UniProtKB/Swiss-Prot annotation:
Protein name from the UniProt record: Iron sulfur cluster assembly protein 2, mitochondrial
Phenotypic effect of disruption: Cells deleted for both ISU1 and ISU2 have decreased activity of several respiratory enzymes that contain Fe-S clusters. As a result, cells grow poorly on carbon sources requiring respiration and also accumulate abnormally high levels of iron in their mitochondria. Knockdown of ISU1 in ISU2 knockout cells reduces cell growth, decreases cytosolic tRNA thiolation, and increases association between SSQ1 and GRX5.
Boundaries of the annotated transit peptide in chain numbering: 1-26
Family indicated by similarity: Belongs to the NifU family.
Pathway assigned in UniProt: Cofactor biosynthesis; iron-sulfur cluster biosynthesis
PANTHER family: IRON-SULFUR CLUSTER ASSEMBLY ENZYME NIFU HOMOLOG
Cofactor binding summary note: Binds 1 [2Fe-2S] cluster per subunit.
Top-level taxon in the UniProt lineage: Eukaryota
Amino acid sequence: MFARLANPAHFKPLTGSHITRAAKRLYHPKVIDHYTNPRNVGSMDKSLANVGTGIVGAPACGDVIKLQIQVNDKSGIIENVKFKTFGCGSAIASSSYMTELVRGMSLDEAVKIKNTEIAKELSLPPVKLHCSMLAEDAIKAAIKDYKTKRNPSVLH
């Protein structure tokens, strides 16, 4: 019996359709949408004074998020947002959703976003709440970076 189990000829590889069906059973449709069609993926020039960059990670699972905001210096409104995430579907979905959420917000509004808002919108299970926490930490880090660039003598 064990010899049969050890024989690779008896295993069928998972195809894209198998993976998609499994994901649909485990994830809410909003997570699948943001994972398969992520919004605002990319990078901005972090050396620009009106661009704030936040890079955060979770050592326990290996997820890393880089989130960047471009702020209108006169109005304080976030005009552009980009992200790159190395991580699971929930981390990518949380990042993508965050970019949609903060575009058009003031810095004061964006810094108040809590991970629970993201988790609720995406219907994340408790085991994936850390992904929404990373998105919250990333926007806060990006805002801090932007403010530090604008006034380096003040700690935020």
